[in-house]
Amino acid sequence: MSSHNHGSHHEPAHSHGHGHVDEDMLSVEQAYERVMARFQTLEFEEKALLDCMGQVLAEDIKSPLALPPLANSGMDGYALRHSDIVGASHETPKNLEVIGIVAAGHMPNRTVGPGTAIRIMTGAPIPDGADTVVPFEETDEVERKREGKPLDNVAVFADMPTGCNVRPAGEDISEGTLVLERGIIVRAAEIGVIASLGMDSIKVIRRPIVAVLATGDELETAGTPLSDGKIYDSNSFSVAASIADAGGIPKILGIARDSLTDLTTKLEATSGCDLVVTSAGVSKGDYDIVKEVLNQKGEMNFWAVRMRPAKP
């Protein structure tokens, strides 16, 4: 398939200028299916996580651990036993001894027994013996701080159900869960999830290297003076940008002049590339020689596609 740097005619799609449908031409969908049927998956590579942005995941990702790994608090408050606050209210508060504090990232060093509580911060592991977390707002903590009283005791004003504000281990992801399937494109969200599993590298399909070649004596390279009868090559840049946007690595080969020798030389420079995209030179004009050269190099899988803009 190819496109021209020239403007296109605005005739109805699927026809020549005389309204005749060429039965030998493929639909865009048929052409796409033929192209995709010839592709094979490229080899994978293991790369640092941040270097994988936009690439295709080559393996299933299963969680090696539970997330969160331990039961933890969903609120800043007091970790305690529900049995100690049954019937608690502002009229009938339940008073408990505060025996410690635990912050996120630290393990509790005390066990919550009858009549006791531990101050706990959001994300901190639940101490042994505790089964419920009561937020600070449902206690007299604010009042105690305002009055300068020590936080060695607390009055609880709410009878909160067992397990309230406790996030169980594995609530987000249980160990062994299939988190991401091979074949997806790795974006920012996927990178965050993978990092949360403790992984700093993954296997991805390597990016395809795609050669881009424009053909025609009428073309000049952007950034050079424009001679009479010439136009600037724009297709190479738009195609290369599309390749990069889709996750490939574009390799612009420049402009091949309308000679078999020059075109053949340029195409020989595509070794190491996974795909070659040519622009122009595939019509029926005297100097449209891409088809001739390609037929010498291999099999022509299909020729014309019914689409606009593209076919003259």
Question: Would you name each region that the model predicts?
Answer:
Residues M36-E43, D60, I126, D140, ...:
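Structural signal for hydrophobic packing residues in well-ordered secondary-structure cores
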Residues H4, H14, E29-E33, E45-G54, ...:
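Flexible glycine/proline-rich
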Residues H4-L26, A79-I252:
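Short, glycine/charged-enriched hinge/interface segments at domain edges or termini
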Residues E23-S89, P93:
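Intrinsically disordered, low-complexity, positively charged segments
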Residues K230, S236-S238, D245-P312:
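Short glycine/threonine-rich loop/turn motifs
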Residues V35, V133, D140, L219, ...:
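Short gly/pro/ser/thr-enriched loop/turn and capping motifs at secondary-structure boundaries
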